[in-house]
Amino acid sequence: MGQVKQAIIEVEDFVCGCLREGRTLNQTIRDARESLAAKTNPYFDDEDLVENKYYQFKGAE
């Protein structure tokens, strides 16, 4: 279970970084899929998770 939590935290950190750079949702999803982390973390390919995290952080701003 710890590995799953760590994998999700990596996605959260990635999405947060994209928001700081002013990336759009579509850019963030594309970047997540193309990132090196996607090779070892299947959650980077989960569009729904990336979208949920994007709006979760966007709403917190």
Regions found by a protein language model. Give the residues of each.
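Short, charge-rich amphipathic interface segments used for partner binding and complex assembly
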Residues: 25-60
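N-terminal acidic leader/helix
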Residues: 1-25
